[in-house]
């Protein structure tokens, strides 16, 4: 039986890594050279707009390879820039924005109908 089957990983660990602080001119091939040492990669997307430059997403085939890459490449020096490698958390990225939007909608409804929140006893 494979040893990996018995290892419990933290819930934030997944196959999708978000990489920040990349050199702006880094290519996908260079990213494959750096990240490919840790396992098979399904896809790499390097940011190319003004808002996403210096960032990338790396998708590994295996979650353990992604964990190994995250552990070893966070703080790795590439062209005098230290990489920030994180597990991508889509729910965390949008949860706060979603909550703020819902609160704003609630406040608008209260204002529209002149409602007040009852005070707790």
Curated annotation (Swiss-Prot):
Region of interest called Interaction with pre-mRNA branch site, as start-end residue ranges on this chain: 12-25
GO MF annotations in UniProt: mRNA binding
SMART domains: RRM
Keywords: mRNA processing, mRNA splicing, Nucleus, RNA-binding
Start and end residues of each RRM domain: 15-90
Domain of life according to the entry: Eukaryota
Gene Ontology annotations for the cellular component aspect, listed alphabetically: catalytic step 2 spliceosome; precatalytic spliceosome
Protein's cellular compartments: Nucleus
InterPro entries noted in UniProt: Nucleotide-bd_a/b_plait_sf, RBD_domain_sf, RRM_dom, RRT5_SRSF_SR, SF3B6_RRM
One GO process term, biological-process aspect: mRNA splicing, via spliceosome
SUPFAM superfamilies assigned: RNA-binding domain, RBD
This protein's record includes keyword Nucleus: yes
Subunit text: Component of splicing factor SF3B complex. Component of the U11/U12 snRNPs that are part of the U12-type spliceosome.
Function as written in the Swiss-Prot or TrEMBL entry: Involved in pre-mRNA splicing as a component of the splicing factor SF3B complex. SF3B complex is required for 'A' complex assembly formed by the stable binding of U2 snRNP to the branchpoint sequence (BPS) in pre-mRNA. Directly contacts the pre-mRNA branch site adenosine for the first catalytic step of splicing. Enters the spliceosome and associates with the pre-mRNA branch site as part of the 17S U2 or, in the case of the minor spliceosome, as part of the 18S U11/U12 snRNP complex, and thus may facilitate the interaction of these snRNP with the branch sites of U2 and U12 respectively.
Family according to the record: Belongs to the SF3B6 family.
Protein's name in the database: Splicing factor 3B subunit 6
Taxonomic source organism: Drosophila melanogaster
Originating gene: Sf3b6
